[in-house]
């Protein structure tokens, strides 16, 4: 197998390995939409710290990375009464969690995977769609 680009999948062939865009996601690491207990570090300011559920929002194509992008969940959102576009209500039944909460899509964080605790649930597709919309708003995408 020679080196080159496979136009059909956007893959790059290096020797006998296929790398780059279009790879199938590996079977290791958390998946997009999974909820893990995360020990959010104290970075100062008005961001969540300590152990909270967090939704994995990075693409599954980065599952082999040593880092992960998560959005924190909280059951106490002070801005909830104003219903800002970056705050997504998550019902317990939508996530497999013991109580309702809020995804704080204005606070996505890239963290080392060692800060991830056990898997606590998974967002259903409808809840993940709402998180995607809120992330687009918060990040200007």
Predicted regions and their residues:
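Conserved functional hotspots at enzyme active or ligand-binding sites that engage polyanionic ligands
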Residues: 1-141
